[in-house]
Amino acid sequence: MSNGIVIIGSGFAARQLVKNIRKQDATIPLTLIAADSMDEYNKPDLSHVISQGQRADDLTRQTAGEFAEQFNLHLFPHTWVTDIDAEARVVKSQNNQWQYDKLVLATGASAFVPSVPGRELMLTLNSQQEYRACETQLRDARRVLIVGGGLIGSELAMDFCRAGKMVTLIDNAASILASLMPPEVSSRLQHRLTEMGVHLLLKSQLQGLEKTDSGILATLDRQRSIEVDAVIAATGLRPETALARRAGLTINRGVCVDSYLQTSNADIYALGDCAEINGQVLPFLQPIQLSAMVLAKNLLGNNTPLKLPAMLVKIKTPELPLHLAGETQRQDLRWQINTESQGMVARGVDDADQLRAFVVSEDRMKEAFGLLKTLPV
């Protein structure tokens, strides 16, 4: 009898994979094991929960039981996988073990928390579970410090500001979204955040946190400090690789996989935020959807390589939303920026005047799909 496919994880990547497998095979045994409740929620909604007044439970779209029934699954929620015996093809938890024919790691990524004194006072918003643990503190907080001015930090800063809170955002870089685009392109959003009342502390460093009678004292460089009620770490994600490492798989930033989503072990695959596909970590929805479609075919006996097109990344800052695509972080591009009252189109071209990247905002986001077609893959 077939042991079927075991999937470790229950987030967006795991669910997309299940749906794609079940479109092609209704009966192959599918087992999912995850440390959380396995209820479905839309992770991008976490960037807007405060202004929307949503509680953690409001985010649930489908319970684990409903998911299991709909797709004929064996689910093991609230279960920590402790080990993978790759030779025997066995996954182990403290009280259980599962044989597999094929194993998929969809373990996601965890929020990186800077190593400063008092780091345990920092909150993270990387899952429904994490939000549930701190929703009362965040709802009651009047003064909020967001550490990190990247995509998530910028989204959260705007959301907390829209909810009427006093928001300070701190980052080492000289501009927001510094790892995604140059300052001349991000300046429109940066200006909008400042207009809304977000206090930007750029080229600044958090040095420590300390609980006080009236809140949390954040010590900064240059002998500065501010007092706040909550501190959120938005300094990026780290792929969860510990299990894969213990199983003897090849690890770099993430779990290394090839174009077939196969790890260094022929029977183990990786998908989603934990995977590093041919040297790239792509923690965005579209590449995960496309990867899940390809992996479902390969798990069922096909041999289909993943071919990713040029893809849009959306920055969900409602007062000034942005779409970007291509190699926006490249240092050698020349940016042609067209700004109007209704939005911006910024084109990044190389020495041969070939479009390599673009960023569009507000009403001009409708131009994104035309630009996307002209980007080299």
UniProtKB/Swiss-Prot annotation:
Gene name for this UniProt entry: norW
Any GO CC annotation of this UniProt entry: cytoplasm
InterPro entries: FAD-bd_OxRdtase, FAD/NAD-bd_sf, FAD/NAD-binding_dom, NO_rdtase_NorW, Rbx-bd
Keywords: Cytoplasm, FAD, Flavoprotein, NAD, Oxidoreductase
Function: One of at least two accessory proteins for anaerobic nitric oxide (NO) reductase. Reduces the rubredoxin moiety of NO reductase.
Pathway noted in the entry: Nitrogen metabolism; nitric oxide reduction
Cofactor(s) essential for the protein: FAD
Keyword check for Cytoplasm: yes
Major subcellular location class: cytoplasm
Taxonomic path: Bacteria, Pseudomonadati, Pseudomonadota, Gammaproteobacteria, Enterobacterales
EC number: 1.18.1.-
Compartment(s): Cytoplasm
Gene3D superfamilies: 3.30.390.120, FAD/NAD(P)-binding domain
Catalysed reactions, semicolon-separated: 2 reduced [nitric oxide reductase rubredoxin domain] + NAD(+) + H(+) = 2 oxidized [nitric oxide reductase rubredoxin domain] + NADH
Keyword presence, Flavoprotein: yes
An annotated Gene Ontology molecular function: oxidoreductase activity, acting on iron-sulfur proteins as donors, NAD or NADP as acceptor
Protein name per UniProt: Nitric oxide reductase FlRd-NAD(+) reductase
